[in-house]
Design a protein with these regions (language model features):
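A generic fold-level signal
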Residues: 3, 40, 137-139
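Conserved hydrophobic/amphipathic alpha-helical signal-anchor segments
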Residues: 23, 30, 34-79
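Alpha-helical interaction segments
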Residues: 18-19, 45, 52, 83, ...
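Short, surface-exposed interaction loops/tails
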Residues: 133-181
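N-terminal single-pass transmembrane signal-anchor helix
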Residues: 1-29
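Extracellular/periplasmic head regions of type IV pilus-like filament subunits
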Residues: 57-143
Length: 181
């Protein structure tokens, strides 16, 4: 009886098929994780808005931001780093203030390369200061809450804060909302 062995070609074909299947699984897994992080970002925004509204109900206004030091972005409060001081004034309304699931920078803050920059941002605009009114026309102050980047499809996130023809935070952030007082 003659023993049958696998030929080199047969072994290479099996290895190639395993490689293709592994790649397909990894791509699917990576895409699923990205979608989950985007969903988490939206859920976090909802959580933060609820906490901000509770703060406003108690104090009569939204909190002023605490610019994030040398990591700040144009006086915005951002969640970069460990997020320990991000929106610390919400501590009595949240067990822990959410931060972006990736929460990282790709070098200096450059929102033109947002595909590698992930953070949450908050800014309070005082309507009595014409520099910060941005043509919004609100009779009172307002706040903007945002996150920089979605990982899957930014077009599905329709929340883009705009005021008149002057201010469009959608140019800086994939998701942004205005909270008028």
């Amino acid at each position: 009886m003659k023993k049958r062995y696998f030929t080199l070609i047969e072994l290479l074909v099996v290895i190639a098929v395993i490689g293709v299947l592994t790649t397909m699984v990894m791509v699917y897994y990576s895409s699923t994780r990205k979608k989950a992080r985007d969903t988490q970002r939206i859920n976090d925004m909802t959580t933060i808005v609820k906490a901000l509204n509770s703060y406003k109900s108690e104090k009569g206004h939204y909190p002023n931001e605490t610019p994030s030091g040398s990591m700040g972005y144009n006086n915005w409060e951002i969640s970069i780093g460990d997020g320990a001081n991000f929106m610390e004034y919400l501590e009595s309304y949240l067990p822990k203030t959410p931060v972006d699931p990736l929460n990282r920078l790709a070098g200096a803050i450059d929102l033109s390369s947002r595909d590698k920059t992930f953070f949450y941002a908050y800014h309070h605009y005082d309507s009595t200061d014409p520099v910060y009114n941005h043509g919004c026309g609100f009779a009172s102050s307002y706040a903007v809450l945002a996150f920089t980047t979605t990982e899957v499809n930014s077009n599905k996130f329709k929340e883009r804060a705009t005021c008149g023809t002057f201010a469009d935070w959608g140019n800086e952030f994939d998701y942004s909302i205005i909270l008028p007082e």
